[in-house]
Amino acid sequence: VLVGTSNSASRDDEAKNYNFEGFLKEYLSVDILNYALPGADQDGSLIQYLHSSDYDPKAPPKLIVWELPANFSLEAPLTYRQLIPAINGGCAHSPEVLASASRDLPELKTAQRIELLSNTGRQRQDLQDLNRAFLEIKISDSKVKDFYIITYYDNGSRDKVWYRREGVVDGGLYYLELSQAPEHRGANLMSVFMEPVKALETPTTVEVQLCR
């Protein structure tokens, strides 16, 4: 499987600058499933592949070639907090669903927050120090690609993550591994909020699960 940027993407001959896919096919003597996308940023095409029906976590590819320009950084924690749950197959392949909720979102203004998941009151669970736990978020309107997910803990700390998916990459499904930052250790997860960067002009439905 080949993922990457416009340098590796399948294009018409007139627009093609390189033939990396053809080079791999010729010298490896294998067929190549090319998911590289122009304008998908550094991990967009890999996310596109992992979320597709071509990827099976029970029968993963023997090799993924991930082409990246030298100026792209692989140090951003959010990259791996999204990729690891996707590689493992999400909640469908998770042994335990800790919490779940579905919310019908009304029209929302920019920076207006809405709670997706609550862990308070009589139904409060012990959701502290969850190793490899992650959120699976499904948004019915696949055009919603620019928003924050904010996780609050009972010690006052919070984890605010910005999702900004490029237009060429499909929306609708998002993963977020819970933060392992020191400030959240020993704290119980209280709630998960969504905050759109751009106004939501039409109602949409969001389903969220906490799995591990």
Where are these regions (language model features)?
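Extracellular glycan-modifying ectodomains
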Residues: V1-R212
